[in-house]
A protein has these predicted regions:
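Junction motif at the cytosolic side of a transmembrane helix
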Residues: 180, 184, 237-256
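Helix-loop-helix units of permease transmembrane domains in multi-pass membrane transporters
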Residues: 75-108
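Secretory targeting signals
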Residues: 33-75, 103-183, 218-237
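Juxtamembrane non-transmembrane "cap" segments at the membrane-aqueous interface
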Residues: 128-142, 196-211
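Aromatic- and glycine-rich beta-strand/loop motifs that create alpha-glucan
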Residues: 1-26
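Membrane-helix interface segments
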Residues: 21-23, 94-95, 99, 187-192
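Central hydrophobic cores of alpha-helical transmembrane segments
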Residues: 26-33, 188-202
Length: 256
């Protein structure tokens, strides 16, 4: 396959994504999910940082993970059902098709989480909320975690973006997992819900140790340096994603 065909495949997926309402609805959905996760009207402790951290900790954040998977996670079953995959394979090959789709599922989920967070933060600022209230809240806990240098320099917006990026790495993995389930389950609601159920089971079974899904929270810092911690978290997200890609490839190969 030449580079022109590869570019056409990526351009086709990008156009398909941007022209679809799902990604825009998902971004808004993530913002709303964070807000309603706090289960109260207004900002926690009167500030945006506490509201965002608490909102991303409570059970409502799981709805945000569903929104992250919503735009693209069911692409494999959709392409197989409407035979669009055969058109794709004329211009490409199966391996390239699977790699491209998984990349879009994974990166779209991260993008939705980050942009949804940014929308939430901007909404809080427009509503007149302060970034922090140093007399109360979770600042002391956050200062012991990753990216504390951003908090010390009062770069609160950038801190929340980095926090959401780490959550995005988890949402990317969960979205690819949903894509894998979509090859076995035709009910799209169930497909989007299953990774969240697995996520909840992991939380219930693993306890409070950081070396589970909690490692994606930026208030935990598994390594001494921020870049080391981020690299570890990136590997924890990408390696299972690659393994799922291999399973997806084999499953589609059998169905063609």
């Amino acid at each position: 396959m030449n580079y022109k065909s590869k570019g056409l495949l990526i351009k086709s997926d990008l156009s398909r994504l941007l022209k679809c309402y799902k990604i825009y609805a998902a971004i808004i959905g993530v913002s709303i999910a964070i807000l309603f996760s706090t289960e109260q009207i207004g900002l926690i402790n009167g500030n945006i940082l506490d509201t965002y951290i608490q909102g991303s900790e409570l059970s409502g954040i799981m709805i945000a993970y569903v929104f992250c998977a919503f735009p693209f996670a069911t692409v494999f079953c959709e392409d197989l059902d409407n035979k669009y995959i055969r058109y794709e394979l004329i211009r490409s090959n199966l391996k390239r098709y699977v790699v491209t789709k998984i990349a879009f599922i994974y990166l779209t989920a991260i993008l939705v989480m980050v942009l949804g967070t940014i929308l939430f933060l901007l909404s809080g600022r427009i509503a007149g909320g302060d970034w922090v209230n140093e007399s109360v809240g979770c600042m002391n806990v956050l200062l012991n975690g990753s990216y504390s240098i951003l908090l010390k320099k009062e770069h609160y917006f950038l801190y929340c973006v980095m926090y959401s990026l780490q959550l995005g790495l988890l949402s990317g993995l969960l979205s690819v997992l949903a894509g894998y389930f979509s090859l076995y389950i035709h009910n799209r609601v169930t497909v989007l819900a299953l990774p969240i159920i697995i996520y909840q089971i992991l939380i219930e079974c693993s306890g409070n140790t950081i070396y589970t899904v909690f490692i994606f929270r930026a208030y935990n810092r598994p390594m001494h340096k921020d870049w080391e911690s981020f690299s570890l978290i990136l590997l924890i997200s990408i390696i299972p994603t690659i393994l799922l890609g291999c399973l997806i490839y084999k499953k589609i190969q059998k169905r063609l």
